[in-house]
Amino acid sequence: MQPFIFLFILLVIGMMAKNQSLIIAVLFLLIVKSIGLSSKVLPYLEQKGIQLGVTIITIAVLVPIATGKIGFKELAESVRSIYAWIAMLSGIAVALLAKGGVALLAKDPHVTTALVLGTILAVSLFKGVAVGPLIGAGIAYVIMKIVDVFS
């Protein structure tokens, strides 16, 4: 019963924050639990969900290339802009942080609870976007490594 209550609270928070991704995710989980598929679906999502999500995000990022909106001409033009270089370096940094985040979440799953809470707070209070857990885990991973060096 506790998972249903917790998910319902998250649904209410998602509705108050008008966060469609959180609402859809919670409704999906409530339906899976309600129709008795949780023993099959949830372990799979727990194991492969982040990779599936990363794959979907990667597909979305590559769509402009597939549609022809971004081609070699746009690529060549973009390297002439300082903002493009800043964006490229930011993309590299975020990808490396996310890599550390995936490793941390796999190694230390209880960190997920704190990351999810932080993401929910950011989404509901500050109109943030719910991609935080992966990047948050990456930032936590880097900070934990720094703490390890000094302790």
Curated annotation (Swiss-Prot):
Q: Which residues cross the membrane?
A: 4-24, 52-72, 85-105, 115-135
InterPro entries, A to Z: UPF0756_TM (IPR007382)
One term under GO cellular component: plasma membrane
Principal place where this protein is found? Answer: membrane
Keywords of the record: Cell membrane, Membrane, Transmembrane, Transmembrane helix
Task: List cystine links.
Answer: none
Instruction: Provide the protein's localization.
Output: Cell membrane
Q: Which family is it part of?
A: Belongs to the UPF0756 family.
Name of the protein: UPF0756 membrane protein Aflv_0503
Native species of this protein? Anoxybacillus flavithermus (strain DSM 21510 / WK1)
